[in-house]
C-alpha cells in the first residue's frame, strides 16, 4: 500500500509495503522525501507534530499503519520547519546584530552540527514566582510564528520598560527593531524579513505546549548572559522527560509531540478571564444566546450584542462574541438554554457576580478544546491556586479570593503563556494568548477531527447462509472515493435475512474479504456482484473489521460541595421551562448545516389544525431525513413543534405563513451563519422511560454531569431510536456520514440487548421490532414498513372510534398519533400476503407514499391511531366516503372528517351528477313504461343490471346512475338502437336472465362477506383515493360496495327477488306481443299498398306480390294464420308469395326513411295532429333491419285504414296538381356512368322538363341530398312522397297489364336516387318492352 502525506502544498507519496509499519516510521520516511522534494540538505530542520487523516482523525504515533489508514489515503502533516530562506539561529550570514547563546558558540564554530537541537541542561532557565512578582513580563515565543506579530511578547528585566504589553503597544523580543535590548542594535531589515516570510506551519494544538519552550529553530536566540536561562531550560527538559516516560513512545524525526491522551491535564483558566461585576440591581446591558459546539454540546452563553450606553459597554465588562462559561458557582456548560437562563437569574440576586468569560479571540480555541474532551471531568481545578505547581508553575499566582469551581481536565488547543496578574486583571480586555502557527497550511478543518476514523478495532470472521430471503444486509461506500477506491461498509441490517438470524453482523462493520477475496480496490458494484454470486443455500464467509465502541462514562466529581441530593435533583428538574399546559418543554438547538448542504436541514414538517375551530396549531416535525443536518445532529425529534427559527418566532402565525418563514430562514439566514437555531417544544417523556447514564433520575451524579435524558442522547447516545442499547459517544462522525446515519448506531437486536430493562422506543412506541432494522435510507422510496403484532385479532375488530382524534394537536399524545413508519403499518406486499393469524377478518386497502419536501413543507396530518383502532365503533365509515382527492389539503380532510362526525353514520360519497332513483315500489308500472330493462347484458364487470338492494360507489364515481343503465326515454329512435332483431334479443334476454341470477348469487355472497367487514379497519388508502379506479380490481371494488338500507330483513330481499323475476317475465311477454303487432302492422301496410286495383286510392301504390321478400325472417304457420285473420278483418285478399325474393330495392326505402327524418326535424314545432296527418302519406317500407319496431303497435289497423282513406281523398287531387310542376334534378355521385345510361334509356316527361325550368322552385334545387332547402321544406317532403307513391302506382298498373304476377315483379326504382351498380345491371338485363314505361321522379 501507499499513502500521500501533505506538507502544506507539497504532497509526498510514501510506499508502505504491506502496511505493517508504525506511524512514526511513516513520518520519518515522509520527512526524508519532503527534504528531497524541496531540495534541502539532510540537516534541514523539520518537526512533525502529528499526522491527521483526510477525514479528520489524528493518527497515533505507535499505531500500525494498515489499521488506521487505507491504501491511497491522504494524510496531512502538522509540522514546523526551518526557514527556507535562511538557515541559522542568529549566527547565519543573513542575521545581523544577533548572536547565539554562548553555550553554542564553540559547537557552531567547530563543526557543522545543527544548531536546532535541544539545549543542554546547563543552559536552562527557571521562571520563579519571585521573578514574576518583580513585574518582569517574560513572554516566550517562537520566532517563526507570525500569529503574535501584533501581540505583546517581550523579554525584559527590571531595567526595561514596565509598560504592560497590549495590542496598542506590540513588542517582540528577538531580532526585531524597537526591542530595547542592552548592548544590541535593532535591525529593521530583520523585522521586515520576519513579516515577509513564507511560513509553512499549521494551527497548533495542545500537544505542542510541552515543547513550546524547547530549543529549536522555532525559538529565537536568548542571551546566554541572562541569569534565568539555565534554570528555565533545566525545568523544561525535566517536564519533557517525564512526558516521554509516561507515553513510552519513541519520538519521530524532529522530536514530535506525544499523543494527546497522555498529555498532562490542563485547565481552562488560561484562556478564561474573570469579570467581577458589582450587582447594583440594574441590568447589565447584554444580549446572550446559547453557544453550542459543532458536536451539539452547549458550551455556555454567547454575548451577542451590547446595548448602547449599558453597564457592560460603559465599564468595558464584556465584548461581543465573548463566551460566558460560568457564573459564580454555576457551570453553564452542557446546560440547556432555559437552565442557563435560570442560573443567570439566580446569580443576579447576589451582591457580587463573578463571570468566567472566554474572550472572543479565544473562542475558537475554546470550542476546539471542548471537542477534544472525552466526557471526562476533573473537580476543583478551575482556579489557579488549586493546581500543583509542578505541572505549571506559571499558573499559580492568581487572587486567592476567587471562587472555586470545577474545570475541564483535557488539554486545550491553545493556552496562555503567561499568568493573569492582579494588577492587570482589568487593564487588558483579554490576556495575550499563546502563539498560534500560521494558518495558510490548514488543509482540513473537519468538525470531526477529534474522532479518529481509523481506531484500532478487531477483525471478525462471519459465515452467513443464504436463504430465500437473501443475506439480509445492505452495503455502502464513500460518496467521493480517495485514490479511485473506497472501503465498503455494512449500511443496514434488514429485518429479514441471514444477517439478522446470525446476529453477529452490525451496521458500520467494514468488509475486508468476501469468500477469501480481498476487497481492497474494488468498487461497490463489484462487491455487490460478488455477494450476489452466492448460490441459494450456500455459505458466504465475510471478514469484517469492527472498530471498538467502548462507552466512556463521565468521571464523578469528588468535591462534596458539588454533590447533589435527590431533592436538589428534583428541584433542578423542575426548573425546566414548560408550556402553560405543563405537557411540553422548550428546547433550543443550534444545528450546524452540512458542508454540502444537499439535504438542507433535512426535516419534513407538517401543519396541524384544531378539530374544533380549524385554527392553526403550529408547525411540527413530521420526519427527519437521513443524511441531513438534523439527522446528523441527532437532537431534533419527530413531533417536535417548531417555536422559533433563527430568532424568528413562528407562534401566532398561520401555517402557511409559518411555512414561508421557515423556508426563507433556512435558505438565507441558515446559509449565512452555517447553522440554524431552533427553539422547539417537546412533550415530556413518561417516568417509565429508560434514562441514559447521567440523566436526572440518577441522584448520585453531580449537577455538572446531570443532563436531561434527551440532551444526553443528543450529545452521547449514538442510537437515539432505542434507549439502552450500546451507547457509544465516540461514534465515528466520518463513518456516520458514510453510513447516512443520523448519529445512530444501528445494532442487531440479537446482540447486546438489555436483559433486565424493558426496551422503550422513542416517542413511546410499542415495544416490538426496533425501527432501525428497516431500511431507513430508502424510506422515501418504499411503502410503509410492515410489522407482526400479536394482537391482530384486536385490530381486526376495531375502526376509528372518534374522527376528532385524526388531528394531531400539540397536546395529543404522540403514541396515539398515526405513525407512517411506526407500528400498525403494512407494506403492500404484506397486505397482499395477509400476514395475520386470521386473514379472513382483515381487508386492508392500498395506501400510497406520502411525499415530503426536503425542506419539509407538507400540509399533512397523521391519522388512524392505535388506541382508536383498538376500541372503535363497528359502524363507522370513514373510508372512501369522505370524497377526497389526492391533492386534498389538511383543511379538506379535517372538514370531511368533521362532517362525518356530525352526521353520525350517514355515509358520504363522492359528489354524484344526479340523485339515484330507487326501485323499491310500483315495479309493475315501471316495467310497462321504462325501457331501462331492455338493454342486453354486457360482460360481468359492467354495472348492467343492478339488483334492487345494492348500489355501488363505482357507478356514482364514474358519473353513471347505478340502477338505470340507459336513458329513461322510451323513444322510437332510441328503441331501435337499443333493441336488435327479436331472435337476437330473445337470446340476449335468456343470457341476461341467467347472468342476472348468477350475479345475484355473487352479490349475496359479497353481502355476506361485507357483513363481517362492516367494522373493518380502514387505512389511509380508504381516506384518500389516488389514481383511477380499475374495474377489474376485485379487491377495491368489493371493499367499496355500500349496502343500501332499504331492505333490512331477509324476507324483504326474497320478496323483492321474486317480484323482480315476475316483472322480467311480464316484460318478455309484453315484448313478444309488441313484436307480433309490429310484424302485422308492417305486413298489412305492404299488402294494403301493393293490393288490388281498387286499393289504389288509400294505398297509394298497386299490389306488390313481392313485398314479403323484403322480410328477412320466415313466418311460422302460426304467424301465417294470424296474417290470414288480419286480412279477413280488413276484407282484403292476401297475395301469394313471390317467386323471387332477391329482387329487393332498398333505395326507395332509404329515401323514404331519410325524407321522414328530415320531416321530423322540420316539424318539431307543429302539433301532434299535423304530424300524424303528414305521416299518413308515408308507407312502412321494409328495411335491412325488418325486425325493428314501427312505433305504431298500439294503434288499431282499422283506424289507420279509415283515417288514411279520408285524408288521402281530401288531399290527393290538390297534391297531384302541385306536384306535377315540381322540378326534379338528378344527383351525380360515384355511379355517374350508370346514372347517365339510366337517363338515356328513360327520357323524362314534358311536364317534368318544364317544371325544372320554373324559377318558382329554385329554392328547392339544392335540397335533393336531404338538407334543408328553404321555406317550402314541409310541402316538398309531402309532395315528393306523394309523387313517389303515384309513380309506383302507375308502374304497377303497367306491369299487371303486361305480365303475369308469377314473373316476380321488381321493386320500384327512382331516378333521383342513384341505384347501386348491381341494381343498374339488373335493370339493364330485365329491360324489355313488355315492362312498360318507367316512372320518373
Swiss-Prot record:
List of residues that carry Phosphothreonine: 91
Effect recorded for residue 532 to E: Almost abolished binding to membranes containing phosphoinositol lipids
Gene3D superfamilies: 2.30.42.10, Phosphatidylinositol 3-kinase Catalytic Subunit, Chain A, domain 1
Pfam families in alphabetical order: Par3_HAL_N_term, PDZ
Listed GO CC annotations: adherens junction; apical junction complex; apical plasma membrane; axonal growth cone; bicellular tight junction; cell cortex; cell junction; cell-cell junction
Effect of residue 504 to E: Abolishes binding to membranes containing phosphoinositol lipids
Positions with biased composition (Polar residues): 150-163, 171-188, 207-224, 1138-1147, 1219-1240, 1318-1327
Residues the record lists as Phosphoserine modifications: 25, 156, 174, 383, 692, 695, 715, 728, 809, 827, 837, 852, 873, 962, 971, 973, 1046
Outcome after substituting residue 829 to A: No detectable impact on binding to PKCI
Effect of residue 506 to A: Slightly reduced binding to membranes containing phosphoinositol lipids
Location(s), subcellular: Cytoplasm; Endomembrane system; Cell junction; Cell junction, Tight junction
GO biological process, one term: bicellular tight junction assembly
Result of altering residue 504 to A: Slightly reduced binding to membranes containing phosphoinositol lipids
Coiled-coil blocks: 1050-1082, 1149-1172, 1199-1222, 1278-1299
Function: Adapter protein involved in asymmetrical cell division and cell polarization processes. Seems to play a central role in the formation of epithelial tight junctions. Association with PARD6B may prevent the interaction of PARD3 with F11R/JAM1, thereby preventing tight junction assembly. The PARD6-PARD3 complex links GTP-bound Rho small GTPases to atypical protein kinase C proteins. Required for establishment of neuronal polarity and normal axon formation in cultured hippocampal neurons. Involved in Schwann cell peripheral myelination. Targets the phosphatase PTEN to cell junctions.
Record text about domains: Contains a conserved N-terminal oligomerization domain (NTD) that is involved in oligomerization and is essential for proper subapical membrane localization.
Protein's name according to its UniProt entry: Partitioning defective 3 homolog
Organism, scientific name: Rattus norvegicus (Rat)
Organism placement in taxonomy: Eukaryota, Metazoa, Chordata, Craniata, Vertebrata
Gene name tied to this protein: Pard3
Amino acid at each position: 500500500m501507499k499513502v500521500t502525506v501533505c506538507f502544506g502544498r507539497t504532497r509526498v507519496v510514501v510506499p508502505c509495503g504491506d502496511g505493517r509499519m508504525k506511524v512514526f516510521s511513516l513520518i520519518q520516511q515522509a520527512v526524508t522525501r519532503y527534504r528531497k522534494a524541496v531540495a534541502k540538505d539532510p540537516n534541514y530542520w523539520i518537526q512533525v507534530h502529528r499526522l491527521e487523516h483526510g477525514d479528520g482523525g489524528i493518527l497515533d504515533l505507535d499505531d500500525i499503519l494498515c489499521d488506521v489508514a487505507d491504501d491511497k489515503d491522504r494524510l496531512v502533516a502538522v509540522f514546523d520547519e526551518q526557514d527556507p530562506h535562511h538557515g541559522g539561529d542568529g549566527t547565519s550570514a543573513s542575521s545581523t546584530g544577533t548572536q547565539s547563546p554562548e553555550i553554542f558558540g564553540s559547537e557552531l564554530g567547530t563543526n557543522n552540527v545543527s544548531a536546532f537541537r535541544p539545549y543542554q541542561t546547563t543552559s536552562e532557565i527557571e521562571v520563579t514566582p519571585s521573578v514574576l512578582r518583580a513585574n518582569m513580563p517574560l513572554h516566550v515565543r517562537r520566532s517563526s510564528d507570525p500569529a503574535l506579530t501584533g501581540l505583546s511578547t517581550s523579554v525584559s528585566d527590571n531595567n526595561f520598560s514596565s509598560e504592560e504589553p497590549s495590542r496598542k503597544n506590540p513588542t517582540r523580543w528577538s531580532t526585531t527593531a524597537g526591542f530595547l535590548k542592552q548592548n544590541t542594535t535593532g535591525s529593521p531589515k530583520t523585522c521586515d524579513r520576519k513579516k515577509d516570510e513564507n511560513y509553512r506551519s499549521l494551527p497548533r494544538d495542545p500537544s505542542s505546549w510541552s515543547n513550546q519552550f524547547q530549543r529549536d529553530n522555532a525559538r529565537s536566540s536568548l542571551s546566554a548572559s541572562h541569569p534565568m536561562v539555565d534554570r528555565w531550560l533545566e525545568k523544561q527538559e525535566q517536564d519533557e522527560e517525564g512526558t516521554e516516560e509516561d507515553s513510552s513512545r519513541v519520538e519521530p524525526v524532529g522530536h514530535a509531540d506525544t499523543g494527546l491522551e497522555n498529555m498532562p491535564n490542563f485547565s481552562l483558566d488560561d484562556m478564561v478571564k474573570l469579570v467581577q461585576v458589582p450587582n447594583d440591581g440594574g441590568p447589565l446591558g447584554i444580549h446572550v444566546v446559547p453557544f453550542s459546539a459543532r458536536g451539539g454540546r452547549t458550551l455556555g452563553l454567547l454575548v451577542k450584542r451590547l446595548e448602547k450606553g449599558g453597564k457592560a459597554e460603559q465599564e468595558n465588562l464584556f465584548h461581543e462574541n465573548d463566551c460566558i462559561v460560568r457564573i459564580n458557582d454555576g457551570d453553564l456548560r452542557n446546560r440547556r438554554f432555559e437552565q442557563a437562563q435560570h442560573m443567570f437569574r439566580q446569580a443576579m440576586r447576589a451582591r457580587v457576580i463573578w463571570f468566567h468569560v472566554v474572550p472572543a479571540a479565544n473562542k475558537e480555541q475554546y470550542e476546539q478544546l471542548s471537542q477534544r474532551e472525552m466526557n471526562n471531568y476533573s473537580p476543583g481545578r478551575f482556579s489557579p491556586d488549586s493546581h500543583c505547581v509542578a505541572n505549571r508553575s506559571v499558573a499559580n499566582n492568581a487572587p486567592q479570593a476567587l471562587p472555586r469551581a470545577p474545570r475541564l481536565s483535557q488539554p486545550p488547543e491553545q493556552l496562555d503563556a503567561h499568568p493573569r496578574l492582579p494588577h492587570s486583571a482589568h487593564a487588558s480586555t483579554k490576556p495575550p494568548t499563546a502563539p498560534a502557527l500560521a494558518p495558510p497550511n490548514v488543509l482540513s478543518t473537519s468538525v470531526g477531527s477529534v474522532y479518529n476514523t481509523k481506531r484500532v478495532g478487531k477483525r471478525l470472521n462471519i459465515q452467513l447462509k443464504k436463504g430465500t430471503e437473501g443475506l439480509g444486509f445492505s452495503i455502502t461506500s464513500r460518496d467521493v472515493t480517495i485514490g479511485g477506491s473506497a472501503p465498503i461498509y455494512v449500511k443496514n441490517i434488514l429485518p429479514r435475512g441471514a444477517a439478522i438470524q446470525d446476529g453477529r453482523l452490525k451496521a458500520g462493520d467494514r468488509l475486508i474479504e468476501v469468500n477469501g477475496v480481498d476487497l481492497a480496490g474494488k468498487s461497490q458494484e463489484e462487491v455487490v456482484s460478488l455477494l450476489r454470486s452466492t448460490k441459494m443455500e450456500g455459505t458466504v464467509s465475510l471478514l469484517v473489521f469492527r472498530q471498538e465502541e467502548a462507552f466512556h462514562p463521565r468521571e464523578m466529581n469528588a468535591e462534596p460541595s458539588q454533590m447533589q441530593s435527590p431533592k436538589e435533583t428534583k428541584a433542578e428538574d423542575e426548573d425546566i421551562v414548560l408550556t402553560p399546559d405543563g405537557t411540553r418543554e422548550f428546547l433550543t438547538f443550534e444545528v450546524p448545516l452540512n458542508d454540502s448542504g444537499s439535504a438542507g436541514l433535512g426535516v419534513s414538517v407538517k401543519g396541524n389544525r384544531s378539530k374544533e375551530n380549524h385554527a392553526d396549531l403550529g408547525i411540527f416535525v413530521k420526519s427527519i431525513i437521513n443524511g441531513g443536518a438534523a439527522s446528523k445532529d441527532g437532537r431534533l425529534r419527530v413531533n417536535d413543534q417548531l417555536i422559533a427559527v433563527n430568532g424568528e418566532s413562528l407562534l401566532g402565525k398561520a401555517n402557511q405563513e409559518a411555512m414561508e418563514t421557515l423556508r426563507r430562514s433556512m435558505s438565507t439566514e441558515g446559509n449565512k451563519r452555517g447553522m440554524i437555531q431552533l427553539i422547539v417544544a417537546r412533550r415530556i417523556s413518561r417516568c417509565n422511560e429508560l434514562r441514559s447514564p447521567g440523566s436526572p433520575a440518577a441522584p448520585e451524579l453531580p449537577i455538572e454531569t446531570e443532563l436531561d435524558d434527551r440532551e444526553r442522547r443528543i450529545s452521547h447516545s449514538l442510537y437515539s431510536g432505542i434507549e439502552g442499547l450500546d451507547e457509544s459517544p465516540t461514534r465515528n462522525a466520518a463513518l456516520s456520514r458514510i453510513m447516512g446515519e443520523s448519529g445512530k448506531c444501528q445494532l442487531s437486536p440479537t446482540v447486546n440487548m438489555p436483559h433486565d430493562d424493558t426496551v422503550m422506543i422513542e416517542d413511546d412506541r410499542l415495544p416490538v421490532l426496533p425501527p432501525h432494522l428497516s431500511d431507513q435510507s430508502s424510506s422515501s422510496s418504499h411503502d410503509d414498513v410492515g410489522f407482526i403484532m400479536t394482537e391482530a385479532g384486536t385490530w381486526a375488530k376495531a375502526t376509528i372510534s372518534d374522527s376528532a382524534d385524526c388531528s394531531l394537536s400539540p397536546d395529543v399524545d404522540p403514541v396515539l398519533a398515526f405513525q407512517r413508519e411506526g407500528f400498525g403499518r403494512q407494506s403492500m406486499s404484506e397486505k397482499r400476503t395477509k400476514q395475520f393469524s386470521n386473514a379472513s377478518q382483515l381487508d386492508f386497502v392500498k395506501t400510497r407514499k406520502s411525499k415530503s419536501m426536503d425542506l419539509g413543507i407538507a400540509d399533512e396530518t397523521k391519522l388512524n391511531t392505535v388506541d382508536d383502532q383498538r376500541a372503535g365503533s363497528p359502524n363507522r365509515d370513514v373510508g372512501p366516503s369522505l370524497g377526497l382527492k389526492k391533492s386534498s389539503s389538511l383543511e379538506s380532510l379535517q372538514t370531511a372528517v368533521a362532517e362525518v362526525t356530525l352526521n353520525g353514520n350517514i355515509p358520504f360519497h363522492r359528489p354524484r351528477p344526479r340523485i339515484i332513483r330507487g326501485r323499491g315500489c310500483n315495479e309493475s308500472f315501471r316495467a310497462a313504461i321504462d325501457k331501462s330493462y331492455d338493454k342486453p347484458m354486457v360482460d360481468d364487470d359492467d354495472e348492467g343490471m343492478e339488483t334492487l338492494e345494492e348500489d355501488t360507489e363505482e357507478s356514482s364515481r364514474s358519473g353513471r346512475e347505478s340502477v338505470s343503465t340507459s336513458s329513461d326515454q322510451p323513444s322510437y329512435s332510441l328503441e331501435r338502437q337499443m333493441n336488435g332483431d327479436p331472435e337476437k334479443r330473445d337470446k340476449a334476454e335468456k343470457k341476461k336472465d341467467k347472468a342476472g341470477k348468477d350475479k345475484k348469487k355473487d352479490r349475496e355472497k359479497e353481502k355476506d362477506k361485507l357483513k363481517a367487514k362492516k367494522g373493518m379497519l380502514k387505512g389511509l388508502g380508504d381516506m384518500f383515493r389516488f389514481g383511477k379506479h380499475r374495474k377489474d380490481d376485485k379487491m377495491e371494488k368489493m371493499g367499496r360496495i355500500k349496502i343500501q338500507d332499504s331492505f333490512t330483513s331477509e324476507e324483504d330481499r326474497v320478496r323483492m327477488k321474486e317480484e323482480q323475476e315476475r316483472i322480467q317475465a311480464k316484460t318478455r311477454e309484453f315484448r313478444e306481443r309488441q313484436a307480433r303487432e309490429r310484424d302485422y302492422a308492417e305486413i298489412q301496410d305492404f299488402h294494403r299498398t301493393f293490393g288490388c286495383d281498387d286499393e289504389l286510392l288509400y294505398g297509394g301504390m298497386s299490389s306488390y306480390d313481392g313485398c314479403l321478400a323484403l322480410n328477412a325472417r320466415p313466418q311460422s304457420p302460426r304467424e301465417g294464420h294470424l296474417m290470414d285473420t288480419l286480412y279477413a278483418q280488413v276484407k282484403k285478399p292476401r297475395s301469394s308469395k313471390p317467386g323471387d325474393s332477391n329482387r329487393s330495392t332498398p333505395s326507395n326505402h332509404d329515401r323514404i326513411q331519410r325524407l321522414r327524418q328530415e320531416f321530423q326535424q322540420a316539424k318539431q314545432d307543429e302539433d301532434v295532429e299535423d304530424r300524424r296527418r303528414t305521416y299518413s302519406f308515408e308507407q312502412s317500407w321494409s328495411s335491412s333491419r325488418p325486425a325493428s319496431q314501427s312505433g305504431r303497435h298500439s294503434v288499431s289497423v282499422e283506424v289507420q285504414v279509415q283515417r288514411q282513406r279520408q285524408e288521402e281523398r281530401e288531399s290527393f287531387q290538390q297534391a297531384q296538381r302541385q306536384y306535377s310542376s315540381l322540378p326534379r334534378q338528378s344527383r351525380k355521385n360515384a355511379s355517374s356512368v350508370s346514372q347517365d345510361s339510366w337517363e338515356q334509356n328513360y327520357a323524362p316527361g314534358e311536364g317534368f322538363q318544364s317544371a325544372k325550368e320554373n324559377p318558382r322552385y329554385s329554392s328547392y334545387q339544392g335540397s335533393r341530398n336531404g338538407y334543408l332547402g328553404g321555406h317550402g321544406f314541409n310541402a316538398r317532403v309531402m309532395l315528393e312522397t306523394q309523387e313517389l307513391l303515384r309513380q309506383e302506382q302507375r308502374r304497377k298498373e303497367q306491369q299487371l297489364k303486361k305480365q303475369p304476377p308469377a314473373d316476380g315483379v321488381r321493386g320500384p326504382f327512382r331516378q333521383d336516387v342513384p341505384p347501386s351498380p348491381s341494381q343498374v345491371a339488373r335493370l339493364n338485363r330485365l329491360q324489355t318492352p313488355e315492362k312498360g314505361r318507367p316512372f320518373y321522379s
